[in-house]
Amino acid sequence: MFNEVILIGKLVDKPHLRETQQGIKMATMVLQVERPYRNNLGIRETDYINCILWRSIANQVSDCCEIGSFIGVKGRLQSR
């Protein structure tokens, strides 16, 4: 089995940066992703994907990305 996903979309809000109790940096963010096809009415639907970033990438995205920035995310899916 293989669990890998790549998303490209717009940053909806500024990432929320914090630390775990063990001192590991993490950030949460929402990515707005357009579907690659149109529905029956000819409209592209949009999904809002909650993402969690860890360690140095959490710092980088929090420092460098603004609301509305197009960014790419590569990771895995996990149910919570």
What residue spans do the PLM features occupy?
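Single-stranded nucleic acid-binding surfaces, predominantly the OB-fold ssDNA-binding core
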Residues: 1-80
